A protein has these predicted regions:
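Extracellular/virion structural assembly segments
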Residues: 1-205
Length: 205
């Protein structure tokens, strides 16, 4: 692991992709047959705001060099994804054990019994795992508990009382390209060069 992406490098644009390789064929009768051959992971295309080497890009260049192309992993917290749309603010935990492959997860510890404790599209992680999951249905709690539907299916088992992280979500990722280019897009009136950087990362499983 080679650290956390510099917080001073603010995003200008963000593209989110979900990768899930699927083989599809059809029977003689025309019925679709499908199977998935590897695990889902997220991918991002990110463009960093224009800035000078002295205030953003010096630190950013050094960080990217430390990654040694795709060799190292690092954490990144995309601003549009790191916090939930829901209203939950309490410590939420897994209720009971769950096995790999589950998509419905029992949780308890919700702060109140109302709708939209979590919202569809919110991201969560579980203690002991780095994989990020997306909640795919709005969550209403009852008796401070609820069943949450996630995608992709769990990669590994969950223990009872494992804590759920739903704010300040960190994705563990790696660069996907061997060549990383910092482009000069202009200069200030004082002659300082202005850089811009666009890069792709993929979630590391």
């Amino acid at each position: 692991m080679a650290g956390a992406f510099p917080s001073s490098a603010n995003f200008e644009t963000l593209g989110l992709s979900s990768i899930q390789n699927t083989i599809i064929s059809k029977s003689i009768s025309g019925k679709k047959l499908s199977r998935q051959i590897d695990n889902q992971r997220f991918r991002f295309t990110i463009k960093i705001i224009v800035g000078k080497r002295s205030d953003i890009y010096g630190e950013l260049m050094a960080f990217i060099m430390k990654q040694r192309s795709s060799k190292e992993n690092f954490t990144i917290s995309p601003p549009e994804l790191k916090s939930i749309r829901g209203v939950e603010s309490s410590t939420v935990s897994v209720n009971g054990t769950h096995t790999a492959g589950d998509t419905t997860i029992a949780l308890d510890g919700f702060g109140a019994d109302t709708a939209n404790r979590f919202r569809a599209g919110d991201m969560i992680t579980f203690a002991g795992q780095t994989k990020v999951y997306m909640i795919v249905e709005d969550v209403t709690s009852s008796s401070n508990a609820a069943t949450v539907t996630i995608e992709p299916p769990l990669r590994s088992a969950l223990a009872d009382d494992a804590v759920v992280t739903y704010n300040n979500i960190n994705f563990t990722v790696h660069l996907t390209n061997d060549v990383q280019e910092f482009g000069v897009v202009g200069a200030t009136k004082d002659g300082d060069l202005l850089y811009q950087f666009e890069f792709d990362v993929e979630e590391t499983l």
